[in-house]
Amino acid sequence: MEQLFSAGISLLLSKTYPAAYSCFNRISDEDFSVLYNKALCCFMVKWYDECYRLLCESEQLMSGRNITREAELPEAFLRYDHAEGHPFHPMPQGIPVCLAYRQLLLLKAETAFRLHLYSEVKSISACLGGKYKHIEKLINNITDNDNL
């Protein structure tokens, strides 16, 4: 399993999404990081329905764990994360659950936007305290489209 996961991460980083997905798909013991990485592969090839389904499944696996709204990071890192943070990178194994959940929500917001699930995007933004610049841009795009 570790070799498949490592291979999947390497392939994901090299943008070889079909091969990365194949590696993650062969892992029988799916934890939230495996499901997230499969979802990211789906997002990158514009298979948004499957991406959203996998993210919801991954989120279910996280439920009941100690998920905090904000990772305990120094202020400088939080400012950077809020301004520059994006979900388009693999999720490593062993990542603290609070960071994994934040990363999952960021990708889920992007996916929900592409599926026109605008209330979901707004709900995720509220859950994250409206602090993430790229999610707020998505919401502004929703608002701009509503005004057309």
Residue ranges of model-derived segments:
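Alpha-helical segment of the N-proximal tetratricopeptide repeat
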Residues: 1-26, 107, 123
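Boundary/linker segments of alpha-helical solenoid repeat arrays
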Residues: 32-37, 61-74, 130-143
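Flexible helix-coil transition and linker loops at the boundaries of alpha-helical arrays
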Residues: 24, 63-98
